[in-house]
Amino acid sequence: MFERFLSTETKYLRTSEIRDLLKLTEGKNVISLAGGLPDPQTFPVEEIKKIADDILLNSADKALQYTATAGISEFRRELVNLSRLRGISGIDERNVFVTVGSQEALFMIFNILLDPGDNVVVEAPTYLAALNAMRTRKPNFISITVTEMGPDLDELERKIKDAHSNGKKVKLMYVIPTAQNPAGTTMNTEDRKRLLEIASKYDFLIFEDDAYGFLVFEGESPPPIKAFDKEGRVIYTSTFSKILAPGLRLGWVIAHEDFIKEMELYKQNVDLHTPSLSQYIAMEAIRRGIIQNNLPKIRRVYKEKRDVMLEAIETYFPNDARWTKPVGGMFVFAWLPQKIDTTKMLEKALQRGVAYVPGSSFYADYSGKNTMRINFSFPKKEELIEGIKRLGDTIKHELST
């Protein structure tokens, strides 16, 4: 009934394929490798309970009250301290903005910056929720292939030059340089610096999504691109969903003070501010060292699960498949033989009791028909083995028909 009343922008909104998949698996004997949920055993439950009790006993008048749109000042100062652990310096609370998870940050930033027809560079593949948020702005996507080392920077320069030769500048590049979702790839430090040089040379902004920056479990996590930013060209976002608890719905943005003011104006007209109680809980979790002390456990749990998944893939996937070997994050991305369409194969996989996310959702042009994203952070180890076995059987059956 209401479709004829909807705005044009609303009609561009797309449902989350991942959440649709999770609905399909509810109440069924299906091992879901589809979601991106943290492992609940990594949640510091008792510590959060103690913090919440202390806050409600001593600071309820503030924690349950309205607060500043950009976030509680004390909390933003703690976020400056937390960001130093990722190598970001030379900032203060005026460069920090608190959001309802990094998802709100994505939506706000794309709406603040993008007009219809703007050239936006994205990785291929990239985070599907970011693509969906951008689509409402109707940009022109320029897709850059993700290699084992991250986005192909030679291809990036070539495509930017092509755009310039046609009189079209690039406005923004959205990039996930560390433990990329979905590909699991991590850019090295030199490539990060080179990307920043390219952005400066061709005068575009970089939107850096560092959701998994703290979750590198093999080797050192490279500093974010923001750590090398001298021009204020990088807009950086991260989240507490992966390092504390997703139910708090907390993220943050680090950017030039002028852009933070634009975010403040936008959020005032959307939801006033991010929930105060969640901010107080996260602030105390930083102050008491709970987040910092819990990171080794999170990394250990995810490394063990990644190893289990990779071993199972080696055992059960066909020889002509290939997949990433992530050094952090939550996901493995796989490329199957070209004859397989993973969207069409999904129903058969569900019948065998396993779910994954078809890879075409992660491409701006919906290519990648033979790809899939599989998650290792949430399922139990035995579920990972059995789930990959079921998935391998499905793939082999598909190849034989």
From Swiss-Prot:
What molecular functions are annotated in GO for this chain? pyridoxal phosphate binding; transaminase activity
N6-(pyridoxal phosphate)lysine: modified positions: K242
Highest taxon in the source lineage:
Archaea
Instruction: Tell me where it mainly resides.
Output: cytoplasm
> In its keyword annotation, does this UniProt entry include Transferase?
yes
Family assignment from sequence similarity: Belongs to the class-I pyridoxal-phosphate-dependent aminotransferase family.
Please describe the quaternary structure of this protein.
Homodimer.
Which protein are we looking at?
Uncharacterized aminotransferase SSO0104
The species is Saccharolobus solfataricus (strain ATCC 35092 / DSM 1617 / JCM 11322 / P2)
